């Protein structure tokens, strides 16, 4: 089975390559004043986040969300709520390289908060980026 490279070691640096988990073992040779030691660290690499371009409500009970396109990802997850703390938020998943989505069945005359994050599927597991900053919109 081929394992995808998650990180690359370059001198004394660990460079993220792809989303996923990697075990990195650090080894120190024995010296005159200390014994040899090694430590294994698990590193989780997540995709880069994206940002919202705009959230607009031009028709009743709907909002159109547009965002900046991210590279090398499987899709996006949009979260929206009437509460600014995003409690009881609903989610919409958009696969592929789309840069726009429409939120439907919203309540008219109410303010909604929207945020977005990217995800990458690696070996059947989804790795999510951090959330973007929130934008708000009043629904027509």
Predicted stretch roles:
Residues 5, 74-76, 112:
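Short beta-strand/loop motifs in extracellular/secreted proteins, especially
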Residues 29-34, 121-127:
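Short, solvent-exposed loop/turn segments at the edges of extracellular beta-sandwich modules
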Residues 46-72, 125-140:
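Pro/Thr/Ser/Gly-rich low-complexity, intrinsically disordered linker/stalk tracts
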Residues 103-124:
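Beta-strand-rich modules
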């Amino acid at each position: 089975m081929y394992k995808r490279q998650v990180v690359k070691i370059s001198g004394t640096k660990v460079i993220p390559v792809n989303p996923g988990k990697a075990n990195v073992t650090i080894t120190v040779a024995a010296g005159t004043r200390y014994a040899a030691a090694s430590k294994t660290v698990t590193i989780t690499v997540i995709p880069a986040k994206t940002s919202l371009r705009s959230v607009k409500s031009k028709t009743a009970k709907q909002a159109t969300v547009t965002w900046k396109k991210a590279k090398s990802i499987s899709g996006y997850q949009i979260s929206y709520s009437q509460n600014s703390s995003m409690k009881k938020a609903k989610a919409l998943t958009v696969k592929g390289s789309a840069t726009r989505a429409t939120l439907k069945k919203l309540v008219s005359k109410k303010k909604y908060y929207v945020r977005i994050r990217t995800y990458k599927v690696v070996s059947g597991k989804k790795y999510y980026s951090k959330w973007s900053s929130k934008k708000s919109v009043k629904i027509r």
